């Protein structure tokens, strides 16, 4: 099936991925590519419309950072955002200059000219009945002369050309960022652009994607066998379910229990995949191997390297027992592809395969199968539900690759891991029971390698401490600590201290990101 597509050209904005996510939310397929792709690529892509992203440069300084001229010659609508609007203006004969007043943050915009982009979209009206929009600005330059054929469709006191349009050609520019949630009606503006201005339908949906992906996997793999490292995380789980839907028993999954998983995670993975879905899963208990190599190691980076190295060793050993395997499957998703493509310039450049299991494809001499590489995380979750995976598995919070290895501060010991996984399970159980789990973006317990004095019954105790961490965030770049009810925290603390022998104190982390990170290590 051939989809109607939007092409997004990336000029290095911090939020370019958000543009793509917002377009996909409209059930319209899009791809994000560096701004300097070739004319041939753009023509072959056959876009219904093109979006030019923001970026950190000034058009009068960065003379090489231009949209290919073919963008304005294809006869399709174009939307320029921030820098994208400025390069559109400059390339089409307008003028851009440094602004005496820079704008960073919320701004109020007056819509003008009854443009198709803003028609009927407003946050409120002023006394004269003019539509007003609350938008998010981030710019130090401004358009001072419009290109021929353009009119002003939005302005404010500090930015007289805050939005512009040549409606005859379908060219629009906005100085603000409609892709961020701070622009209240940004979603409606992007929907208006892709559906009404570009004429895209709603032909990007999961049922169709499953059918297409299954056909593609079958054509790619043929009758050869595939091996996949199953972690129990969302991406590898959905990849396994999709590949199994396509090729059945040609897929073998290897699930490595390194002793650093969540409570009962191994049993849950085997129950879901092996018994419920009928996927072939090899369950390897490598706890002793991992713990042996982690003994005496306290540095977090060293722990990460050891856990990664040992996973590769275990996986290689199991792969060697499957000589017919010709493909290595991975749960690479679209943000991985974009991030691994990032060049020093900050733009998504030279996109290549993202090996999220370090070194395995080269070492094993296997071909790489990445069936999720076109999907964002929210789309992966939607796909997982459509494939029949349990909702709790698909919508569980992120879990670090090294597992509890980086949630046990300092040296990792089996005793510490056992205490931590039980405390963590209590925290998660109570969050679910209180209907707080889905209100937090990530929640977990951390084991602190210190002891504190306590009193239990008539006796003095000297036992370990755990910290609880829960955050709320939209993008994980910044995060606010979750303001959980004190009664809930009290219940969690009481259960942990009473049910997990060896812990006598529970603390709650109220640090935001920044200055703290979400994980402790």
From Swiss-Prot:
Residues 204-396 form the GMPS ATP-PPase domain. Pathway: Purine metabolism; GMP biosynthesis; GMP from XMP (L-Gln route): step 1/1. The active site is at residues 82, 177, 179. Its EC number is 6.3.5.2. The keyword Transport does not apply. Keywords: ATP-binding, Glutamine amidotransferase, GMP biosynthesis, Ligase, Nucleotide-binding, Purine biosynthesis. It catalyses: XMP + L-glutamine + ATP + H2O = GMP + L-glutamate + AMP + diphosphate + 2 H(+). It comes from the Bacteria. Homodimer. This is GMP synthase [glutamine-hydrolyzing]. It comes from Azoarcus sp. (strain BH72). The lineage of its organism: Bacteria, Pseudomonadati, Pseudomonadota, Betaproteobacteria, Rhodocyclales. The gene is guaA.
